[in-house]
Design a protein with these regions (language model features):
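Beta-lactam-recognizing serine transpeptidase/beta-lactamase-like catalytic domain environment
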Residues: 1-139, 146
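Short, gly/Ser/Thr-rich active-site loops of penicillin-recognizing serine hydrolases
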Residues: 56-59, 151-174
Length: 174
């Protein structure tokens, strides 16, 4: 999927507001993961891979290292105990990420009963090694918020991946 993002010169005030919380654009899970690699890699965006690579991929500068670090800190607070992302926490590791709950579109615009639940995150925040995006299409269990549906899957998958990759736990993780 190529995704969809209107050209900035065409953004109205209402489009700017909607874009700030994720409406009016579309991205695939791989595109979202690619964007998160810039946060995990000092502002340099990498091409995502599902495989362990023998050589690191070439990156494209996307944002400054300072902005990337600031955003990592913000993402870490998004999984604090009192937030919707708390179910994404991985025991022994500092992680960060963002929940998302997307109303699906139909012929008449946004639906009222069909959702995509999303969690995109980075682990460990102290020395990023993994970007994981969980996207669950049309969850059926009654809950549909990203923090309730996708965040626990992120926690499980990312925790297992960190252990399989022998990433040492953080000493200062909750």
């Amino acid at each position: 999927s190529t995704g969809s993002l209107p050209a900035p010169v065409r953004w109205s005030r209402s489009e700017r507001a909607a874009l700030s919380y994720g409406y009016g654009l579309s991205v695939s899970a791989v595109q979202l993961a690619s964007a998160y690699t810039a946060l995990a890699n000092d502002g340099v965006r990498l091409q995502p891979s599902l495989l362990r690579l023998s050589e690191p991929p070439q990156g494209i500068p996307a944002i400054s290292p300072t902005v990337a670090n600031d955003l990592l800190n913000i993402l870490e607070t998004s999984v604090a105990a009192y937030t919707g992302g708390r179910r994404a926490r991985v025991e022994g590791y500092r992680v960060g990420g963002k929940t998302g709950t997307v109303r699906k579109t139909g012929q008449q615009g946004y639906t009222t009963d069909a959702y995509r639940s999303v969690f995109a995150g980075i682990a460990p925040i102290s020395d990023p090694r993994i970007v994981t995006v969980v996207m669950i299409d049309h969850p059926k269990a009654g809950e549909f918020y990203g923090g309730a549906v996708a965040a626990p899957v992120f926690s499980s998958v990312t925790g297992n991946a960190l252990r399989l990759l022998d990433v040492p736990p953080d000493h200062d993780a909750e």
